[in-house]
Amino acid sequence: MKETKTTDNPFALPKNPSMKRRAKFNDYHDRRMYMITMVTEGRRKLFGEVIGDPNIEIGKPNSPHIELTECGKMVEKCWREITLHEPAVSAGYIQLMPDHFHGILFVRKDMKKHLGDVLRSFKIGCNKGFRSLGSLFGSLSYYDKALDKALNKALDKALNKELDRKHGLLFERGYNDKILYGEGQLARWENYLRDNPRRLLVKRMNPDLFRVRRGINVAGMRLDALGNLFLLSRPEINQVQVSRKATEEQLAQYKSFFMEAAQRGAVAVSPGISKGEKAILRMLYDMKSPVIVLLQNGFGQFAKPGGAFFDACADGRLLLLAPWEYDSEHEKITRQQCLLLNEIARRIALRNG
């Protein structure tokens, strides 16, 4: 499983790495709900330190949480005050992490301003607060834990220099937004945000399982990987491939086969494209059985597994493989890509068959 470069990957899609592009179909003046993400300039850990026991339920003593610095408290305060400056916008739940934050914004009615203008004003307020805190760094001992020598040097430089078009003061230029569409999505967002501190602690405990490896040689192919690479060495790996036309009876037979295989320690591999394949993968997740999943898109710069993938990855039960580089505008998988993913799954299964 040697790591190699993927520049000549025959499956490669055009590079399109930006996570900060706006949705072309969305009017950012309209009534809408968003989850906003902003990252500190240089990924500096300015907002606090995540502490606690990842095995303790959220909300109980010593459960995972972030202990905010004064800088983190200032950003949280600015977020809460967005409504004071733009009455059409309500600031919802915010989860600060050491070097970024996620926050929910509700545009309650159509507004003249673009959402980007509202967030630009928020950043200006944060920058003012950051400058004020900067003058106190020399006398506040509790900043010693949160701000390293590189920060002090970078801050001094930033405070005495005009910002260029590529860099910000406190935050990176731009922001990422996700638009709420379906019923129940808001609750899922809030649960995800509250779970962020626990997820970070789990990643710290299992760093190798959450690191993207580029150009891994898998059955003669170069793939990017995240998760437990040792699953590729299991003696039995079975491909999950179910036709879209499969009957309920046929699906039940497939489930029975993969359930028995999982009970004897077999690994399943699949891109999980059809409804039947998804149903079998869900069954295997519930059984806490090992699974190799082929992704329809590649890994971004800060890729991490989400949802059910996260805990499966932490437990060493999951390996994610991607034959293509990340494409931020990836929308719908093509028939050719489906065929390629199933062929890759077939080769992985045959390799261990």
Model-found features: residue ranges?
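Glycine-biased, small-residue-rich flexible motifs in mid-sequence functional cores and linkers
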Residues: 212-353
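Short catalytic/metal-binding and nucleic-acid-binding patches
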Residues: 1-216
